[in-house]
Protein backbone atom coordinates (compact mmCIF):
# COMPACT_ATOMS: atom_id res chain seq x y z
CA UNK A 1 0.00 0.00 0.00
CA UNK A 2 2.85 2.38 0.80
CA UNK A 3 4.46 1.69 -2.57
CA UNK A 4 1.09 2.36 -4.26
CA UNK A 5 0.76 5.71 -2.51
CA UNK A 6 4.22 6.78 -3.73
CA UNK A 7 3.65 5.90 -7.37
CA UNK A 8 -0.08 6.69 -7.48
CA UNK A 9 -3.09 4.49 -8.06
CA UNK A 10 -3.83 2.96 -11.44
CA UNK A 11 -7.18 3.44 -13.14
CA UNK A 12 -8.34 0.03 -11.95
CA UNK A 13 -7.64 1.03 -8.35
CA UNK A 14 -9.40 4.41 -8.65
CA UNK A 15 -13.05 4.80 -7.56
CA UNK A 16 -15.46 4.87 -10.48
CA UNK A 17 -17.09 8.11 -9.37
CA UNK A 18 -13.71 9.87 -9.63
CA UNK A 19 -13.19 8.66 -13.20
CA UNK A 20 -16.77 9.51 -14.17
CA UNK A 21 -16.45 13.01 -12.70
CA UNK A 22 -13.30 13.76 -14.68
CA UNK A 23 -14.80 12.41 -17.92
CA UNK A 24 -17.98 14.45 -17.35
CA UNK A 25 -16.07 17.70 -16.94
CA UNK A 26 -13.88 17.07 -19.99
CA UNK A 27 -16.82 16.12 -22.22
CA UNK A 28 -18.87 19.10 -21.05
CA UNK A 29 -16.09 21.62 -21.69
CA UNK A 30 -15.22 20.17 -25.11
CA UNK A 31 -18.87 19.98 -26.14
CA UNK A 32 -19.42 23.58 -25.02
CA UNK A 33 -16.49 24.83 -27.09
CA UNK A 34 -17.53 22.77 -30.12
CA UNK A 35 -21.12 24.07 -30.00
CA UNK A 36 -19.91 27.65 -29.63
CA UNK A 37 -17.71 27.32 -32.71
CA UNK A 38 -20.57 25.68 -34.61
CA UNK A 39 -23.03 28.45 -33.70
CA UNK A 40 -20.53 31.11 -34.69
CA UNK A 41 -19.92 29.44 -38.04
CA UNK A 42 -23.66 29.14 -38.62
CA UNK A 43 -24.06 32.86 -37.94
CA UNK A 44 -21.28 33.67 -40.40
CA UNK A 45 -22.99 31.59 -43.09
CA UNK A 46 -26.35 33.20 -42.35
CA UNK A 47 -24.87 36.70 -42.68
CA UNK A 48 -23.09 35.61 -45.90
CA UNK A 49 -19.59 36.21 -44.54
CA UNK A 50 -18.01 33.49 -46.58
CA UNK A 51 -14.43 34.71 -46.17
CA UNK A 52 -14.71 34.85 -42.38
CA UNK A 53 -16.32 31.41 -42.38
CA UNK A 54 -13.36 30.09 -44.37
CA UNK A 55 -11.02 31.69 -41.83
CA UNK A 56 -12.95 30.01 -39.03
CA UNK A 57 -12.49 26.69 -40.80
CA UNK A 58 -8.76 27.37 -40.95
CA UNK A 59 -8.72 28.11 -37.22
CA UNK A 60 -10.46 24.78 -36.64
CA UNK A 61 -7.81 23.10 -38.78
CA UNK A 62 -5.09 24.67 -36.64
CA UNK A 63 -6.78 23.45 -33.46
CA UNK A 64 -7.18 20.00 -35.00
CA UNK A 65 -3.46 19.99 -35.88
CA UNK A 66 -2.61 20.87 -32.28
CA UNK A 67 -4.90 18.11 -31.07
CA UNK A 68 -3.20 15.62 -33.38
CA UNK A 69 0.24 16.71 -32.18
CA UNK A 70 -0.88 16.38 -28.57
CA UNK A 71 -2.32 12.92 -29.21
CA UNK A 72 0.81 11.65 -30.97
CA UNK A 73 3.13 13.16 -28.39
CA UNK A 74 1.19 11.83 -25.43
CA UNK A 75 1.02 8.33 -26.88
CA UNK A 76 4.66 8.21 -27.97
CA UNK A 77 6.15 10.04 -24.96
CA UNK A 78 6.91 6.81 -23.09
CA UNK A 79 8.55 5.32 -26.19
CA UNK A 80 10.64 8.44 -26.89
CA UNK A 81 11.80 8.64 -23.28
CA UNK A 82 13.13 5.08 -23.59
CA UNK A 83 15.58 6.13 -26.33
CA UNK A 84 18.94 6.25 -24.52
CA UNK A 85 22.11 8.03 -25.63
CA UNK A 86 25.52 8.55 -24.10
CA UNK A 87 25.65 11.21 -21.41
CA UNK A 88 28.63 12.80 -23.15
CA UNK A 89 26.28 14.09 -25.86
CA UNK A 90 24.54 16.36 -23.37
CA UNK A 91 26.71 19.46 -23.46
CA UNK A 92 25.77 22.10 -20.91
CA UNK A 93 26.34 24.80 -23.55
CA UNK A 94 23.01 23.85 -25.12
CA UNK A 95 20.99 24.07 -21.92
CA UNK A 96 18.31 26.71 -21.61
CA UNK A 97 19.60 27.50 -18.12
CA UNK A 98 23.13 27.16 -16.79
CA UNK A 99 24.11 24.54 -14.25
CA UNK A 100 24.46 27.19 -11.57
CA UNK A 101 20.83 28.13 -12.03
CA UNK A 102 19.78 24.57 -11.32
CA UNK A 103 22.26 24.17 -8.48
CA UNK A 104 23.78 21.08 -10.09
CA UNK A 105 27.50 20.49 -10.53
CA UNK A 106 28.87 19.15 -13.76
CA UNK A 107 30.63 16.22 -12.09
CA UNK A 108 27.42 14.98 -10.52
CA UNK A 109 25.59 15.39 -13.82
CA UNK A 110 28.04 13.20 -15.74
CA UNK A 111 28.84 10.51 -13.18
CA UNK A 112 25.47 10.01 -11.47
CA UNK A 113 22.93 10.02 -14.25
CA UNK A 114 20.27 8.29 -12.22
CA UNK A 115 20.33 10.90 -9.48
CA UNK A 116 20.18 13.64 -12.09
CA UNK A 117 17.14 12.04 -13.67
CA UNK A 118 15.58 11.81 -10.24
CA UNK A 119 15.80 15.58 -9.85
CA UNK A 120 14.11 16.27 -13.16
CA UNK A 121 11.66 13.42 -13.72
CA UNK A 122 8.51 12.20 -12.04
CA UNK A 123 9.08 9.30 -9.68
CA UNK A 124 7.46 6.74 -11.95
CA UNK A 125 9.43 7.90 -14.97
CA UNK A 126 12.72 7.86 -13.07
CA UNK A 127 12.26 4.32 -12.00
CA UNK A 128 11.89 3.13 -15.58
CA UNK A 129 14.55 5.37 -17.15
CA UNK A 130 17.29 4.46 -14.66
CA UNK A 131 16.79 0.72 -15.25
CA UNK A 132 16.57 1.01 -19.06
CA UNK A 133 19.45 3.39 -19.78
CA UNK A 134 22.00 2.19 -17.25
CA UNK A 135 25.22 3.82 -16.16
CA UNK A 136 26.65 6.55 -18.44
CA UNK A 137 23.50 6.78 -20.53
CA UNK A 138 20.28 8.77 -20.24
CA UNK A 139 17.08 9.40 -22.22
CA UNK A 140 17.32 11.51 -25.37
CA UNK A 141 14.34 13.51 -24.07
CA UNK A 142 12.94 12.81 -20.63
CA UNK A 143 9.29 12.07 -20.02
CA UNK A 144 8.79 15.29 -18.09
CA UNK A 145 10.54 17.24 -20.86
CA UNK A 146 8.05 15.87 -23.38
CA UNK A 147 5.18 16.90 -21.14
CA UNK A 148 6.59 20.43 -20.94
CA UNK A 149 7.00 20.52 -24.73
CA UNK A 150 3.39 19.44 -25.12
CA UNK A 151 2.25 22.29 -22.88
CA UNK A 152 4.31 24.78 -24.88
CA UNK A 153 2.85 23.73 -28.25
CA UNK A 154 -0.66 23.84 -26.82
CA UNK A 155 -0.15 27.33 -25.35
CA UNK A 156 1.45 28.56 -28.59
CA UNK A 157 -1.49 27.44 -30.74
CA UNK A 158 -4.17 28.86 -28.43
CA UNK A 159 -2.30 32.15 -28.00
CA UNK A 160 -1.85 32.57 -31.76
CA UNK A 161 -5.54 31.97 -32.42
CA UNK A 162 -6.47 34.55 -29.77
CA UNK A 163 -3.96 37.11 -31.06
CA UNK A 164 -5.21 36.66 -34.62
CA UNK A 165 -8.80 37.19 -33.52
CA UNK A 166 -7.86 40.30 -31.51
CA UNK A 167 -5.92 41.72 -34.46
CA UNK A 168 -8.82 41.30 -36.88
CA UNK A 169 -11.35 42.59 -34.35
CA UNK A 170 -9.42 45.81 -33.70
CA UNK A 171 -8.71 46.29 -37.40
CA UNK A 172 -12.38 45.83 -38.29
CA UNK A 173 -13.46 48.34 -35.64
CA UNK A 174 -11.10 50.90 -37.15
CA UNK A 175 -12.22 50.24 -40.72
CA UNK A 176 -15.90 50.42 -39.77
CA UNK A 177 -15.25 53.89 -38.34
CA UNK A 178 -14.64 55.04 -41.93
CA UNK A 179 -18.21 54.25 -43.00
CA UNK A 180 -19.34 57.83 -42.41
CA UNK A 181 -16.71 59.03 -44.88
CA UNK A 182 -17.93 56.54 -47.48
CA UNK A 183 -21.52 57.71 -46.99
CA UNK A 184 -20.43 61.31 -47.56
CA UNK A 185 -18.52 60.34 -50.69
CA UNK A 186 -21.53 58.53 -52.16
CA UNK A 187 -23.81 61.48 -51.38
CA UNK A 188 -21.33 63.78 -53.10
CA UNK A 189 -21.25 61.50 -56.14
CA UNK A 190 -25.04 61.51 -56.39
CA UNK A 191 -25.36 65.27 -55.89
CA UNK A 192 -24.69 68.13 -58.29
CA UNK A 193 -21.69 67.50 -60.56
CA UNK A 194 -20.23 70.98 -60.11
CA UNK A 195 -20.46 70.81 -56.34
CA UNK A 196 -18.94 67.37 -56.40
CA UNK A 197 -15.93 68.51 -58.41
CA UNK A 198 -15.41 71.46 -56.08
CA UNK A 199 -15.43 69.24 -52.99
CA UNK A 200 -13.16 66.66 -54.63
CA UNK A 201 -10.62 69.32 -55.58
CA UNK A 202 -10.75 70.67 -52.04
CA UNK A 203 -10.11 67.22 -50.62
CA UNK A 204 -7.24 66.69 -53.06
CA UNK A 205 -5.67 69.99 -52.02
CA UNK A 206 -5.96 69.03 -48.34
CA UNK A 207 -4.44 65.64 -49.11
CA UNK A 208 -1.48 67.27 -50.87
CA UNK A 209 -1.06 69.81 -48.07
CA UNK A 210 -0.85 67.12 -45.39
CA UNK A 211 1.66 64.92 -47.21
CA UNK A 212 3.64 67.12 -49.61
CA UNK A 213 3.95 70.55 -47.98
CA UNK A 214 6.80 69.73 -45.59
CA UNK A 215 10.31 70.72 -46.83
CA UNK A 216 11.57 67.19 -46.22
CA UNK A 217 9.00 65.81 -48.67
CA UNK A 218 11.13 66.84 -51.65
CA UNK A 219 14.23 65.02 -50.40
CA UNK A 220 14.37 61.33 -51.29
CA UNK A 221 16.16 60.44 -48.04
CA UNK A 222 14.58 62.81 -45.53
CA UNK A 223 11.09 61.83 -46.67
CA UNK A 224 11.65 58.40 -45.11
CA UNK A 225 12.40 60.02 -41.77
CA UNK A 226 9.30 62.16 -42.17
CA UNK A 227 7.16 59.10 -42.95
CA UNK A 228 8.65 57.32 -39.94
CA UNK A 229 7.45 60.14 -37.67
CA UNK A 230 4.04 60.41 -39.36
CA UNK A 231 3.07 56.84 -38.53
CA UNK A 232 2.86 57.75 -34.83
CA UNK A 233 0.17 60.40 -35.35
CA UNK A 234 -2.52 57.82 -36.02
CA UNK A 235 -4.33 56.38 -39.01
CA UNK A 236 -5.44 58.11 -42.21
CA UNK A 237 -7.40 61.34 -42.33
CA UNK A 238 -10.64 62.04 -44.13
CA UNK A 239 -8.84 63.77 -46.99
CA UNK A 240 -6.56 60.73 -47.36
CA UNK A 241 -9.55 58.41 -47.57
CA UNK A 242 -11.24 60.56 -50.23
CA UNK A 243 -8.07 60.84 -52.33
CA UNK A 244 -7.21 57.14 -52.20
CA UNK A 245 -10.82 56.21 -52.89
CA UNK A 246 -10.93 58.46 -55.94
CA UNK A 247 -7.66 57.05 -57.22
CA UNK A 248 -8.90 53.47 -56.90
CA UNK A 249 -12.22 54.15 -58.64
CA UNK A 250 -10.54 56.05 -61.47
CA UNK A 251 -7.82 53.44 -61.93
CA UNK A 252 -10.29 50.58 -62.36
CA UNK A 253 -13.03 52.60 -64.14
CA UNK A 254 -15.58 52.10 -61.38
CA UNK A 255 -18.56 54.42 -60.82
CA UNK A 256 -18.16 57.15 -58.21
CA UNK A 257 -21.14 55.67 -56.37
CA UNK A 258 -19.29 52.38 -55.90
CA UNK A 259 -19.12 51.36 -52.23
CA UNK A 260 -15.37 51.42 -51.69
CA UNK A 261 -15.76 50.79 -47.95
CA UNK A 262 -17.64 47.52 -48.43
CA UNK A 263 -14.96 46.48 -50.92
CA UNK A 264 -12.30 47.05 -48.26
CA UNK A 265 -14.31 45.06 -45.73
CA UNK A 266 -14.61 42.13 -48.15
CA UNK A 267 -10.89 42.40 -48.89
CA UNK A 268 -10.09 42.40 -45.18
CA UNK A 269 -12.19 39.28 -44.68
CA UNK A 270 -10.34 37.57 -47.53
CA UNK A 271 -6.95 38.58 -46.12
CA UNK A 272 -7.94 37.30 -42.69
CA UNK A 273 -7.70 33.81 -44.15
CA UNK A 274 -4.00 34.48 -44.82
CA UNK A 275 -3.30 35.84 -41.34
CA UNK A 276 -4.95 33.03 -39.40
CA UNK A 277 -3.03 29.80 -39.00
CA UNK A 278 0.59 28.85 -38.49
CA UNK A 279 2.18 28.14 -41.87
CA UNK A 280 5.18 25.85 -42.25
CA UNK A 281 7.70 28.75 -42.47
CA UNK A 282 6.43 29.97 -39.10
CA UNK A 283 6.80 26.48 -37.66
CA UNK A 284 10.37 26.39 -38.96
CA UNK A 285 11.03 29.77 -37.35
CA UNK A 286 9.64 28.53 -34.01
CA UNK A 287 11.81 25.40 -34.16
CA UNK A 288 14.92 27.47 -34.89
CA UNK A 289 14.15 29.78 -31.96
CA UNK A 290 13.76 26.78 -29.65
CA UNK A 291 17.05 25.32 -30.90
CA UNK A 292 19.22 28.43 -30.46
CA UNK A 293 17.69 29.53 -27.16
CA UNK A 294 20.73 28.59 -25.06
CA UNK A 295 21.70 30.21 -21.78
CA UNK A 296 23.75 33.37 -22.04
CA UNK A 297 22.30 34.57 -25.35
CA UNK A 298 18.98 35.89 -24.00
CA UNK A 299 17.51 35.04 -27.40
CA UNK A 300 13.88 35.49 -26.41
CA UNK A 301 14.66 38.94 -25.04
CA UNK A 302 16.25 40.17 -28.27
CA UNK A 303 13.70 38.68 -30.67
CA UNK A 304 10.91 40.30 -28.62
CA UNK A 305 11.89 43.61 -30.26
CA UNK A 306 11.66 42.23 -33.81
CA UNK A 307 7.89 42.90 -34.06
CA UNK A 308 8.38 46.52 -32.98
CA UNK A 309 11.03 47.02 -35.67
CA UNK A 310 8.88 45.38 -38.35
CA UNK A 311 5.77 47.38 -37.37
CA UNK A 312 7.71 50.63 -37.70
CA UNK A 313 9.19 49.45 -41.00
CA UNK A 314 5.79 48.51 -42.46
CA UNK A 315 4.17 51.70 -41.16
CA UNK A 316 6.94 53.82 -42.65
CA UNK A 317 6.56 52.11 -46.02
CA UNK A 318 2.79 52.62 -46.06
CA UNK A 319 3.18 56.30 -45.20
CA UNK A 320 5.83 56.60 -47.91
CA UNK A 321 3.41 55.22 -50.50
CA UNK A 322 0.79 57.81 -49.50
CA UNK A 323 3.36 60.63 -49.53
CA UNK A 324 4.63 59.61 -52.94
CA UNK A 325 1.11 59.66 -54.35
CA UNK A 326 0.58 63.13 -52.85
CA UNK A 327 3.82 64.40 -54.40
CA UNK A 328 2.70 63.12 -57.80
CA UNK A 329 -0.62 64.94 -57.43
CA UNK A 330 1.28 68.10 -56.50
CA UNK A 331 3.42 67.81 -59.62
CA UNK A 332 0.31 67.34 -61.75
CA UNK A 333 -1.31 70.41 -60.22
CA UNK A 334 1.72 72.58 -61.01
CA UNK A 335 1.80 71.34 -64.59
CA UNK A 336 -1.84 70.93 -65.55
CA UNK A 337 -4.32 72.13 -62.97
CA UNK A 338 -7.08 69.87 -64.29
CA UNK A 339 -7.38 66.17 -63.70
CA UNK A 340 -4.81 65.87 -60.92
CA UNK A 341 -5.31 62.59 -59.07
CA UNK A 342 -3.40 59.72 -57.52
CA UNK A 343 -2.07 57.01 -59.82
CA UNK A 344 -2.07 53.57 -58.17
CA UNK A 345 0.49 51.02 -59.38
CA UNK A 346 2.51 48.09 -58.06
CA UNK A 347 5.77 49.98 -58.49
CA UNK A 348 5.03 51.89 -55.28
CA UNK A 349 5.63 48.76 -53.19
CA UNK A 350 8.68 46.60 -52.51
CA UNK A 351 9.50 44.39 -55.49
CA UNK A 352 6.16 45.43 -57.01
CA UNK A 353 4.27 43.13 -54.62
CA UNK A 354 1.88 44.74 -52.11
CA UNK A 355 1.22 41.33 -50.50
CA UNK A 356 4.71 41.36 -48.93
CA UNK A 357 3.43 43.79 -46.31
CA UNK A 358 0.65 41.38 -45.35
CA UNK A 359 3.17 38.58 -44.85
CA UNK A 360 5.22 40.80 -42.56
CA UNK A 361 2.09 41.57 -40.53
CA UNK A 362 1.37 37.85 -40.28
CA UNK A 363 4.89 37.29 -38.91
CA UNK A 364 4.46 40.16 -36.42
CA UNK A 365 1.28 38.62 -35.02
CA UNK A 366 2.93 35.21 -34.75
CA UNK A 367 6.01 36.59 -33.02
CA UNK A 368 3.87 38.44 -30.48
CA UNK A 369 1.92 35.25 -29.81
CA UNK A 370 5.18 33.29 -29.54
CA UNK A 371 6.50 35.78 -27.00
CA UNK A 372 3.40 35.57 -24.82
CA UNK A 373 3.28 31.76 -25.16
CA UNK A 374 6.85 31.38 -23.89
CA UNK A 375 6.09 33.55 -20.87
CA UNK A 376 2.96 31.55 -19.99
CA UNK A 377 4.91 28.34 -20.52
CA UNK A 378 7.63 29.44 -18.10
CA UNK A 379 4.99 30.10 -15.46
CA UNK A 380 2.95 26.96 -16.05
CA UNK A 381 5.22 24.27 -17.44
CA UNK A 382 8.58 24.70 -15.69
CA UNK A 383 8.97 24.22 -11.98
CA UNK A 384 12.56 25.44 -11.65
CA UNK A 385 12.32 28.78 -13.46
CA UNK A 386 15.00 30.77 -11.65
CA UNK A 387 16.87 31.41 -14.91
CA UNK A 388 13.68 32.58 -16.63
CA UNK A 389 12.37 34.91 -13.94
CA UNK A 390 15.48 36.23 -12.23
CA UNK A 391 15.72 39.38 -14.42
CA UNK A 392 12.42 41.17 -13.82
CA UNK A 393 13.41 44.17 -15.97
CA UNK A 394 13.86 42.02 -19.08
CA UNK A 395 10.61 40.18 -18.46
CA UNK A 396 8.63 43.38 -17.95
CA UNK A 397 10.09 45.01 -21.06
CA UNK A 398 9.27 41.94 -23.16
CA UNK A 399 5.67 41.80 -22.00
CA UNK A 400 5.02 45.54 -22.31
CA UNK A 401 6.64 45.67 -25.75
CA UNK A 402 4.63 42.69 -26.99
CA UNK A 403 1.27 44.03 -25.80
CA UNK A 404 1.86 47.55 -27.14
CA UNK A 405 3.10 46.32 -30.51
CA UNK A 406 0.13 43.97 -30.85
CA UNK A 407 -2.34 46.78 -30.20
CA UNK A 408 -0.45 49.20 -32.45
CA UNK A 409 -0.25 46.69 -35.29
CA UNK A 410 -3.91 45.67 -34.98
CA UNK A 411 -5.52 49.08 -34.64
CA UNK A 412 -3.15 51.18 -36.74
CA UNK A 413 -0.97 49.23 -39.15
CA UNK A 414 -3.45 46.60 -40.36
CA UNK A 415 -6.22 49.12 -41.33
CA UNK A 416 -3.65 51.35 -43.01
CA UNK A 417 -2.33 48.34 -44.92
CA UNK A 418 -5.85 47.41 -46.06
CA UNK A 419 -6.50 50.75 -47.75
CA UNK A 420 -2.98 51.55 -48.99
CA UNK A 421 -2.42 48.16 -50.63
CA UNK A 422 -5.46 48.90 -52.81
CA UNK A 423 -3.18 51.36 -54.59
CA UNK A 424 -1.64 48.55 -56.59
CA UNK A 425 -2.13 47.91 -60.28
CA UNK A 426 -4.71 45.17 -59.81
CA UNK A 427 -7.92 44.94 -57.89
CA UNK A 428 -8.94 42.06 -55.64
CA UNK A 429 -11.70 39.60 -56.49
CA UNK A 430 -13.77 41.28 -53.76
CA UNK A 431 -14.47 44.13 -56.21
CA UNK A 432 -17.54 42.09 -57.19
CA UNK A 433 -20.03 41.38 -54.43
CA UNK A 434 -19.97 37.85 -53.07
CA UNK A 435 -23.62 37.23 -53.95
CA UNK A 436 -22.89 38.11 -57.59
CA UNK A 437 -19.80 35.88 -57.60
CA UNK A 438 -21.79 32.96 -56.23
CA UNK A 439 -24.50 33.50 -58.84
CA UNK A 440 -21.97 33.66 -61.65
CA UNK A 441 -20.40 30.42 -60.44
CA UNK A 442 -23.85 28.86 -60.28
CA UNK A 443 -24.61 30.09 -63.77
CA UNK A 444 -21.40 28.67 -65.23
CA UNK A 445 -21.89 25.39 -63.39
CA UNK A 446 -25.41 25.00 -64.76
CA UNK A 447 -24.20 25.86 -68.26
CA UNK A 448 -21.68 23.08 -68.03
CA UNK A 449 -24.19 20.58 -66.64
CA UNK A 450 -26.85 21.48 -69.23
CA UNK A 451 -24.38 21.26 -72.07
CA UNK A 452 -23.80 17.60 -71.24
CA UNK A 453 -27.48 16.78 -71.79
CA UNK A 454 -28.16 18.92 -74.87
CA UNK A 455 -26.96 18.98 -78.44
CA UNK A 456 -24.10 21.33 -77.71
CA UNK A 457 -20.60 21.24 -79.11
CA UNK A 458 -17.89 22.55 -76.78
CA UNK A 459 -14.22 22.87 -77.55
CA UNK A 460 -11.29 25.05 -76.60
CA UNK A 461 -11.92 27.39 -79.49
CA UNK A 462 -15.71 27.42 -79.86
CA UNK A 463 -18.72 26.58 -77.75
CA UNK A 464 -22.35 26.44 -78.91
CA UNK A 465 -25.54 25.83 -77.00
CA UNK A 466 -28.81 24.55 -78.37
CA UNK A 467 -31.11 27.48 -79.14
CA UNK A 468 -34.16 25.60 -77.90
CA UNK A 469 -32.57 24.89 -74.53
CA UNK A 470 -33.59 27.25 -71.76
CA UNK A 471 -31.27 27.46 -68.80
CA UNK A 472 -32.41 28.85 -65.48
CA UNK A 473 -29.59 29.96 -63.25
CA UNK A 474 -29.48 30.19 -59.43
CA UNK A 475 -30.69 33.02 -57.29
CA UNK A 476 -29.05 36.44 -57.35
CA UNK A 477 -29.61 38.00 -53.93
CA UNK A 478 -28.70 41.62 -53.40
CA UNK A 479 -28.94 41.20 -49.65
CA UNK A 480 -29.58 38.43 -47.20
CA UNK A 481 -32.81 40.04 -46.03
CA UNK A 482 -34.54 40.16 -49.43
CA UNK A 483 -37.39 37.74 -49.87
CA UNK A 484 -37.68 38.14 -53.62
CA UNK A 485 -35.89 35.87 -56.04
CA UNK A 486 -33.81 37.18 -58.92
CA UNK A 487 -33.41 34.67 -61.70
CA UNK A 488 -31.64 34.70 -65.03
CA UNK A 489 -33.20 33.12 -68.10
CA UNK A 490 -31.27 32.49 -71.32
CA UNK A 491 -33.58 31.84 -74.22
CA UNK A 492 -31.11 31.54 -77.10
CA UNK A 493 -27.47 31.03 -77.82
CA UNK A 494 -26.96 34.75 -78.39
CA UNK A 495 -28.61 36.13 -75.30
CA UNK A 496 -25.61 36.80 -73.06
CA UNK A 497 -23.39 39.19 -74.99
CA UNK A 498 -25.43 42.35 -74.47
CA UNK A 499 -23.95 42.71 -70.98
CA UNK A 500 -20.59 43.43 -72.47
CA UNK A 501 -21.81 44.87 -75.73
CA UNK A 502 -23.35 47.77 -73.84
CA UNK A 503 -20.10 48.23 -71.93
CA UNK A 504 -18.02 48.35 -75.09
CA UNK A 505 -20.14 51.11 -76.61
CA UNK A 506 -20.12 53.34 -73.53
CA UNK A 507 -17.38 55.54 -72.08
CA UNK A 508 -18.96 56.09 -68.68
CA UNK A 509 -16.85 55.20 -65.63
CA UNK A 510 -19.68 52.99 -64.46
CA UNK A 511 -19.18 50.69 -67.42
CA UNK A 512 -15.75 49.81 -66.08
CA UNK A 513 -17.49 47.74 -63.45
CA UNK A 514 -18.83 45.55 -66.24
CA UNK A 515 -15.29 44.93 -67.43
CA UNK A 516 -14.48 43.62 -63.95
CA UNK A 517 -17.41 41.22 -64.26
CA UNK A 518 -16.21 40.23 -67.72
CA UNK A 519 -12.78 39.41 -66.33
CA UNK A 520 -14.35 37.36 -63.58
CA UNK A 521 -16.57 35.49 -66.03
CA UNK A 522 -13.61 34.84 -68.34
CA UNK A 523 -11.61 33.32 -65.50
CA UNK A 524 -14.58 31.18 -64.48
CA UNK A 525 -15.15 30.05 -68.06
CA UNK A 526 -11.50 29.04 -68.36
CA UNK A 527 -11.83 26.99 -65.19
CA UNK A 528 -14.88 25.03 -66.31
CA UNK A 529 -13.68 24.61 -69.89
CA UNK A 530 -16.91 25.54 -71.69
CA UNK A 531 -17.42 29.08 -72.90
CA UNK A 532 -20.87 29.93 -74.18
CA UNK A 533 -20.91 32.79 -76.67
CA UNK A 534 -22.27 36.07 -75.39
CA UNK A 535 -24.34 37.78 -78.08
CA UNK A 536 -27.78 38.79 -76.83
CA UNK A 537 -29.53 40.10 -73.77
CA UNK A 538 -29.83 38.37 -70.45
CA UNK A 539 -33.16 39.20 -68.90
CA UNK A 540 -33.64 39.22 -65.14
CA UNK A 541 -37.12 38.91 -63.75
CA UNK A 542 -37.83 39.57 -60.11
CA UNK A 543 -40.51 37.37 -58.66
CA UNK A 544 -42.18 38.72 -55.55
CA UNK A 545 -43.66 36.73 -52.75
CA UNK A 546 -47.13 36.89 -54.31
CA UNK A 547 -45.92 35.71 -57.74
CA UNK A 548 -45.80 31.94 -57.69
CA UNK A 549 -46.38 31.40 -61.39
CA UNK A 550 -44.03 30.66 -64.20
CA UNK A 551 -42.16 33.14 -66.30
CA UNK A 552 -43.14 33.89 -69.87
CA UNK A 553 -42.13 36.14 -72.66
CA UNK A 554 -44.63 38.78 -71.66
CA UNK A 555 -43.38 39.30 -68.15
CA UNK A 556 -42.12 42.79 -68.93
CA UNK A 557 -45.60 43.84 -69.94
CA UNK A 558 -47.22 42.35 -66.87
CA UNK A 559 -44.71 43.47 -64.29
CA UNK A 560 -43.77 46.86 -65.64
CA UNK A 561 -40.30 47.65 -64.33
CA UNK A 562 -39.72 44.16 -62.97
CA UNK A 563 -37.39 43.29 -65.82
CA UNK A 564 -33.85 44.64 -65.70
CA UNK A 565 -30.54 43.86 -67.29
CA UNK A 566 -27.76 42.06 -65.49
CA UNK A 567 -25.57 45.10 -66.13
CA UNK A 568 -27.85 47.26 -63.99
CA UNK A 569 -27.75 44.71 -61.19
CA UNK A 570 -23.95 44.68 -61.27
CA UNK A 571 -23.89 48.47 -61.10
CA UNK A 572 -26.14 48.51 -58.03
CA UNK A 573 -24.01 45.97 -56.19
Curated annotation (Swiss-Prot):
Residues 434-455 are annotated as: Calmodulin-binding. Residues 35-62, 173-271, 315-359, 421-573 are cytoplasmic. It is a multi-pass membrane protein. The lineage of its organism: Eukaryota, Viridiplantae, Streptophyta, Embryophyta, Tracheophyta. One of its GO terms (molecular function) is calmodulin binding. This is MLO-like protein 4. The C-terminus contains a calmodulin-binding domain, which binds calmodulin in a calcium-dependent fashion. PANTHER family: MLO-LIKE PROTEIN 1 (PTHR31942), MLO-LIKE PROTEIN 4 (PTHR31942:SF9). One of its GO terms (cellular component) is membrane. One of its GO terms (biological process) is defense response. Disulfide bonds: none annotated.
Amino acid sequence: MEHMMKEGRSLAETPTYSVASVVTVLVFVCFLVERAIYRFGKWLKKTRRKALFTSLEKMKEELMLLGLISLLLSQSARWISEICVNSSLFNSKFYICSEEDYGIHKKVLLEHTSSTNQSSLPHHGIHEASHQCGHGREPFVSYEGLEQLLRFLFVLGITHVLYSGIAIGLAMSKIYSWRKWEAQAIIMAESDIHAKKTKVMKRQSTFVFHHASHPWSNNRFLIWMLCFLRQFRGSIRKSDYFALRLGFLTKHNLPFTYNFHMYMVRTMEDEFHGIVGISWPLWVYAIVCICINVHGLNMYFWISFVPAILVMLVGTKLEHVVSKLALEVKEQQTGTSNGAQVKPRDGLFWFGKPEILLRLIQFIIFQNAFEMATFIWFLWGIKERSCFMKNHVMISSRLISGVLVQFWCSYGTVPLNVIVTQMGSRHKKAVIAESVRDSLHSWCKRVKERSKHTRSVCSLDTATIDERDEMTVGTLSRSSSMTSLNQITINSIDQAESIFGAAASSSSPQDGYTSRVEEYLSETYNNIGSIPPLNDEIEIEIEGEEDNGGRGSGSDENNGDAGETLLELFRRT
